[in-house]
Curated annotation (Swiss-Prot):
Cited Pfam families: YbaB_DNA_bd
Compartments, record wording: Cytoplasm, Nucleoid
Protein name per the record: Nucleoid-associated protein Lcho_1975
Family of this protein: Belongs to the YbaB/EbfC family.
GO CC annotation, single: cytosol
Keywords assigned: Cytoplasm, DNA-binding
Length: 108
């Protein structure tokens, strides 16, 4: 009986690993948009943190360089937070609330 339970547990673990890998692959194609300056600066990135596009409203190009740099950084950080939220939501569904060690994040 224990052998059967262990085999079933191993099968479940393999299925979960396969599902997590599939979800990670899907997240590489999911895009999120971060914004700052009321949408004047936008960063589009995947949930794997690959930046796809950066959009800067032309009205900002004549303005203060430091302000523009701050807006780009803020938009990037907003995109990262959104990507992490989408990743956590998708992976959380797969782990069904399984607690993770402190500091461990998905995707691995």
């Amino acid at each position: 009986m224990i052998k059967g339970q262990l085999a079933g547990l191993m099968k479940q673990a393999q299925a979960m690993q396969d599902n997590l890998k599939k979800a990670q692959d899907e997240l590489a194609n999911v895009e999120v948009e971060g914004q700052s300056g009321a949408g004047l600066v936008k960063v589009v990135m995947t949930c794997k943190h690959d930046v796809k596009r950066l959009s800067i409203d032309p009205s900002l190009l004549a303005d203060d360089k430091d302000m523009l740099e701050d807006l780009v950084a803020a938009a990037f950080n907003d995109a990262v937070r959104r990507a992490e939220a989408v990743s956590q939501e998708k992976m959380g569904k797969l782990t069904a609330g399984m607690p993770l060690p402190p500091g461990m994040k998905f995707p691995f």
